């Protein structure tokens, strides 16, 4: 329990509090002491932006120095990732849209980087935050439902845009009314089913990623909070190895569902 003193309950609770900026008082607070609705989880925002910047810098730099002669190991690895994502997009998306592959690449790598923050020692960043005088700190952006909801909402906006762009407003509304049962008497039932199905996409997309990453982070915290330091490695190491699969798989699932939703949006009603 390095860096945080107190009982196991206090230790676990402390690691679940966000560093927030209270817009009503213009001050940094812990979510433990938040009494206002108008707050921002600045730790999640900071690390998500930091990782996005890191992603852009690495890929941008590689794009300018890439060579066919003697490629570096990093270049070979990134090219493999790009080819992997490109092949998956071609298998799932059959429309004509040059945005889908770069979008899928961005979604996968960004979410993967955010998920990877869960593999750092659980006390490392909170201990640094304590030295800096910060009341709390959480470093896994994808374990914050606000971040996952924002990602899912952006996907939903794109789905709605391409639905209307491909089919027009009339065609989009017609699709809600005459699918899955193509009969005028079924319009009310069709409309309810399609609207619920449409709205459930961003909800399930965000909660799936949030739930998996939050539970993974919570298990790390429980192991560190309930066991002595010399006994933590017995459970932490195998869980960390397994969690590498979870980190990658959740980023991949989010990307796949994004492509599928956008592919469906490009289908004519």
Curated annotation (Swiss-Prot):
Main location: membrane
Disulfide bridge map: none
Biological process terms in GO annotation: proton motive force-driven plasma membrane ATP synthesis
Keyword terms, alphabetized: ATP synthesis, Cell inner membrane, Cell membrane, CF(0), Hydrogen ion transport, Ion transport, Membrane, Transmembrane, Transmembrane helix, Transport
Any single Gene Ontology cellular-component annotation: plasma membrane
TM region(s), chain numbering: 39-59, 65-85, 108-128, 153-173, 187-207, 218-238, 240-260
Pfam families per the UniProt record, alphabetical: ATP-synt_A
Topology within the bilayer: Multi-pass membrane protein
InterPro entries assigned to the protein according to its UniProt record, in alphabetical order: ATP_syn_F0_a_bact/chloroplast, ATP_synth_F0_asu, ATP_synth_F0_asu_AS, F0_ATP_A_sf
Subcellular localization(s) per the UniProt record: Cell inner membrane
A GO molecular-function descriptor: proton-transporting ATP synthase activity, rotational mechanism
Domain of life: Bacteria
Function field: Key component of the proton channel; it plays a direct role in the translocation of protons across the membrane.
UniProt-listed NCBIfam families: ATP_synt_6_or_A, PRK05815.1-1
Entry similarity comment: Belongs to the ATPase A chain family.
Oligomeric form and interacting partners: F-type ATPases have 2 components, CF(1) - the catalytic core - and CF(0) - the membrane proton channel. CF(1) has five subunits: alpha(3), beta(3), gamma(1), delta(1), epsilon(1). CF(0) has three main subunits: a(1), b(2) and c(9-12). The alpha and beta chains form an alternating ring which encloses part of the gamma chain. CF(1) is attached to CF(0) by a central stalk formed by the gamma and epsilon chains, while a peripheral stalk is formed by the delta and b chains.
Name assigned to this protein: ATP synthase subunit a
Gene of this entry: atpB
